[in-house]
Amino acid sequence: MISGLSHVSIVVPDLAAAARRLRDMYGLVIGEAKVNEEQGVRLAYVELGNARIELMEPARVDSPVAKFLERNPNGGIHHFCLAVGDVESTVTQLRDKGARVLGDGKAQVNVHGARIAFVHPKDFLGALVELEEHQDEEGGAR
């Protein structure tokens, strides 16, 4: 079901300023920003080899990330993402065990073209969890 950690997501009030700080202070390379229209966020990633740091800022005032910044004006950790082989079967297994999946429960597609779903924080020790489908070239879980 779960094959590893994909990324940790940090909401920031200013994506460009956050990218500069991580570059200047830690020497990290931040990828090009992309917009996820469906979620209303602008994203940029720091590749760390076996996982990523995802930086997010609101792209719309009505996005969940904008609401997060209202409660946390300086930003902070928003969620972490677990890699799974098949989002749909993982969601089904979790629901069968009583977990709540956010939204309509159907997988969405992220800016990388991967299928994703979110598990309610009450069902993972208070943390919002994203499930992201990771497959190798042969279509198997990686």
Show the residue positions of the predicted features.
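Vicinal oxygen chelate
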Residues: 12-20, 34, 44-47, 54, 60, 72-142
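Short connector loops at helix/strand junctions that flank enzyme active sites
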Residues: 41, 48-50, 72-77
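Short, charged/polar surface micro-motifs in flexible loops or helix N-caps
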Residues: 49-53, 60-62, 87
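Short, flexible turn/loop "capping" segments at secondary-structure junctions
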Residues: 1-2, 71-73
